[in-house]
Curated annotation (Swiss-Prot):
GO terms for molecular function: ATP binding; dethiobiotin synthase activity; magnesium ion binding. GO terms for cellular component: cytosol. Pathway: Cofactor biosynthesis; biotin biosynthesis; biotin from 7,8-diaminononanoate: step 1/2. Pfam families: AAA_26. NCBIfam families: bioD. GO terms for biological process: biotin biosynthetic process. Its EC number is 6.3.3.3. ATP binds at D53, E114, G115, A116, G117, N174, R175. This is ATP-dependent dethiobiotin synthetase BioD. The active site is at K40. Its cofactor is Mg(2+). Catalyzes a mechanistically unusual reaction, the ATP-dependent insertion of CO2 between the N7 and N8 nitrogen atoms of 7,8-diaminopelargonic acid (DAPA, also called 7,8-diammoniononanoate) to form a ureido ring. It comes from Nitrosospira multiformis (strain ATCC 25196 / NCIMB 11849 / C 71).
Amino acid sequence: MGMGKGYFVTGTDTGVGKTRVTCALLHAFAATGKTVVGMKPVAAGCENGMWPDVELLAAASNISVQREHINPYALVPPIAPHIAADRAGIEIDLEVIRQAHLELKKKADIVIVEGAGGFLVPLNDHEDSVALVQALGLAVLLVVGMRLGCINHALLTAHAVRAAQIPLAGWVANRIDPEMAVFKENVLALEQRLDCPLLGILPYDQNHDARDLSSLLDIARIGMSS
């Protein structure tokens, strides 16, 4: 066991496939013999008494841990986290998340933390996801939802990550628009400009099993100079 390491997964927007990629990353690391656990510090959007992202991350983890460590804050409405928390009469506390993360690091070799929404999403009145990543001391992996406009969103996000002096350790192209024109050219444009390794390209198919998708990710490239 011992103190594990890990990454923070952010995306170019909400709904770009962060959970899909995080689960695939967990399976990829597990395939190398590591103990892995996914964490969703703040989940917003309850369906039938469950938070789907949290369920998927727990299922993709290969050790059993307390649910409140995987997901310290579970908010019912699928809206911006700080607004959902405010409506519930609570304030998201980064120290609570940090302590939960420490507990996971004691138990797993790799902890992969999935953010809420995009990189600059507020978590309370004075802190955002940037402050959370800094508090956890993690490098960022960027999920680019491949659709028209994604180049701008990806470069803006990369700029924000680096402006906060946080390492950008890799990116994943996740195809979310099957009709996207000049797909390959967009991937190439991002490869040329993001200045971090492309870990893989995930196809458009909502039914893909995360374990199958994991074979499309080259985790050995994480953190390499591109």
